[in-house]
Amino acid sequence: MDKLEECKIKNLYNLDETIAKELLEKFTYPWEVLPHIEEFIIETGKKLSKDEYKEIKENVWVHKTAKIFETAYIDGPTIICENATIRQAAFIRGRAIVGKNAVVGNSTELKNVILFNNVEVPHFNYVGDSILGYKAHFGAGSITSNVKSDKKLVVIKNRITNEQIETKIKKVGAMCGDNVEVGCNSVLNPGTIVGKNTNIYPLSSVRGVIKANSIYKSSDNIVDKI
């Protein structure tokens, strides 16, 4: 078995729930995708149907059913998919894929991310250098931290099995699987991996690999869902 099997793309995400399926299928681990998001968006955007998408500014493609509030700021390259909502004062810094029916809310900032379909980051969230799976949801004020305080390259660690993989990347946020729920005002530290269907309690500081189908109450109190 390869290292950190639970961290593989195939075990975190339903790839049928993202326009980035073709990109993700090329890699084993999700953090390997991060350096390639920009190029993929530009290549994909040029192929999108002009009957369905409008290029509202250079390298920013928005589906005609998406709702963009007037005070939202969107830089490219970015793709915003069908029925997505970008609310007031949202700040999309580019290199962002916002999936179908996704919500990017008030004062939420995105940078170098893939949001699968039906993701919600609705209130005061920061999501950078991260991938959020189908129906993942962040409570108000929850953020991904994408750079270590010592500025060293991020290492993915499972503190239970002591397995680890060097990403060789300085900026890695969080990789959250499908149906992950992150409670209000939580911090997902650099290189955090949260398995499918896992809930994170509010006010948590999370690091390392959190297994699927669990409830994270604190770093020393993680229980299986019943």
Where on the chain are the PLM-derived regions?
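Terminal amphipathic alpha-helical/low-complexity segments used for targeting or macromolecular assembly
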Residues: M1-N59, K64, N197, L203, ...
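Glycine-rich hexapeptide-repeat left-handed beta-helix
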Residues: A20-E22, L115-N117, P122-I226
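Conserved hydrophobic/aromatic pocket- or pore-lining residues that grip, position, or stack substrates
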Residues: Y29, A84, V113, A136
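Glycine-rich active-site/cofactor-binding loop and its immediate structural neighborhood
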Residues: V62-K64, I68-S107
